[in-house]
């Protein structure tokens, strides 16, 4: 159970990081 929660949290963190990088690149291109 703990392993599944840890894996889900890691996946969520990776997704959040991808969104932040995508938004950052978009803002750089807009400038």
From Swiss-Prot:
One Gene Ontology term of the molecular function aspect: electron transporter, transferring electrons within cytochrome b6/f complex of photosystem II activity
State the GO CC annotations. Answer: chloroplast thylakoid membrane; cytochrome b6f complex
Q: Which coarse location class describes where this protein primarily resides?
A: plastid
Q: Which GO terms describe its biological process?
A: photosynthesis
Bilayer-crossing residues are 4-24
Is this entry keyworded 4Fe-4S?
Answer: no
Q: Where in the cell is it found?
A: Plastid, Chloroplast thylakoid membrane
Report membrane topology: Single-pass membrane protein
Pfam family, any one: PetL
Matches recorded under InterPro entries:
Cyt_b6/f_cplx_su6
Which keywords describe this protein according to UniProt?
Chloroplast, Electron transport, Membrane, Photosynthesis, Plastid, Thylakoid, Transmembrane, Transmembrane helix, Transport
Question: What is the protein's known function?
Answer: Component of the cytochrome b6-f complex, which mediates electron transfer between photosystem II (PSII) and photosystem I (PSI), cyclic electron flow around PSI, and state transitions. PetL is important for photoautotrophic growth as well as for electron transfer efficiency and stability of the cytochrome b6-f complex.
Q: Which HAMAP family match?
A: Cytb6_f_PetL
Q: Which family does it belong to?
A: Belongs to the PetL family.
**Description of how the protein assembles with itself and partners:** The 4 large subunits of the cytochrome b6-f complex are cytochrome b6, subunit IV (17 kDa polypeptide, PetD), cytochrome f and the Rieske protein, while the 4 small subunits are PetG, PetL, PetM and PetN. The complex functions as a dimer.
Q: What is this protein called?
A: Cytochrome b6-f complex subunit 6
Species this protein is from: Zygnema circumcarinatum
Gene behind this chain?
petL
């Amino acid at each position: 159970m703990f392993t599944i929660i840890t894996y889900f949290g890691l996946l969520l963190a990776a997704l959040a990081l991808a969104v932040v990088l995508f938004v950052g690149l978009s803002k750089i291109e807009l400038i």
